A protein has these predicted regions:
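Solvent-exposed soluble domains appended to multi-pass membrane proteins
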Residues: 1-187
Length: 187
């Protein structure tokens, strides 16, 4: 399913769901994913690099979708969360990126119910998106933490900020007898 078709379906679904009151709608775009991304009939041929054309197309598509949302009656009472799942894995695309440049994902909260002065340079993981998303929707989170995540609109350190990436990577690689037996069913 090409992302432009996904956005068309999403518009139809959101229009229908908006008649039913408060809803959660989630979608995941895939045109920028490996192995080479997916060009659609709307992608420009502006750049020499295929991936650059796909990224430009994706950027225009997401912008167009958000602009459409802004024209809807439900927009003012809606929180939009845009979250990247990971930096590009297309190594050939990042070969010229300086090694000291920290590549991150794009994350954006539109119509957030909370604000902060600390909007850049936080170290965080996807685990922090759980409490942060609820906070931007207006939920009060006692202690600003849920599971292993920290509300990024709080001044509390995330587990990455507190312990460092290497330590967290080591910890999540460890096995758990409980998880192996009861969740993964390895035993």
């Amino acid at each position: 399913l090409k992302d432009y078709k996904l956005c068309e379906l999403a518009k139809n679904e959101l229009t229908e769901l908006s008649q039913k009151g408060k809803v959660n709608f989630t979608m995941a775009t895939i045109d920028c994913h490996m192995p080479q991304g997916f060009l659609c009939k709307y992608c420009p041929n502006t750049y020499d690099n295929r991936y650059e054309n796909i990224y430009a197309c994706q950027s225009q598509l997401v912008n167009s979708f958000v602009e459409w949302c802004k024209t809807q009656s439900w927009y003012q009472n809606t929180t939009i969360v845009l979250v990247g799942d990971h930096p590009t894995m297309a190594q050939q695309y990042v070969n010229d990126v300086p090694s000291d440049y920290q590549r991150t994902t794009y994350n954006c909260f539109i119509n957030s119910k909370v604000t902060t002065d600390q909007i850049k340079n936080r170290q965080f993981t996807h685990m922090d998106m759980y409490p942060t998303t609820l906070a931007v929707m207006g939920f009060n989170i006692e202690g600003n933490k849920l599971a292993l995540g920290t509300n990024l609109f709080s001044e509390l350190p995330t587990i990455i900020e507190k312990y460092g990436q290497d330590y967290i990577n080591e910890e999540v690689q460890k096995s758990s007898e409980y998880l192996d037996k009861n969740i993964y069913q390895f035993n």
